[in-house]
Amino acid sequence: MKEQKLATKQNQVTEAALEVHKNMGLGFGSEEYGWALAYEFGLRNIPFERKKNVKLSYKGAVAGEYNLDFVIGNSLVVSISTGDHLTDMDEAKLKSILRAIKMKTGLTVNFSKDILEIRTV
């Protein structure tokens, strides 16, 4: 059941991101796409937190803090990218963050391509 709910959230995020990409096009920064995506989540009644500050831990000690672009329903992290393309390093970074905050699934969304680029981690 949890996997089905997570898949539904992933689909909702993907559809919202596609709508933002279709309407805004290319050339903006992550702040602008983030604002538009938050607005689209609101229109679609998708529960989210934006710029959620989390503590990164190492062996029980706080190793630093990180602001997540979005957390959807306390189970899905969404990271926004506006680079030329998503890289293995983008994926590795999100995996490390997920591990540090004890979450399992994340999406990296790149708005700077003609075709929206999304990777699931």
PLM feature segments, named:
Residues 78:
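Conserved beta3 VAIK motif of the Hanks protein kinase fold
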Residues 1-24:
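Interdomain/boundary linker segments immediately adjacent to catalytic/signaling cores
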Residues 26-75, 83, 113-121:
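Active-site metal-binding core of divalent-cation-utilizing nuclease and nuclease-like domains
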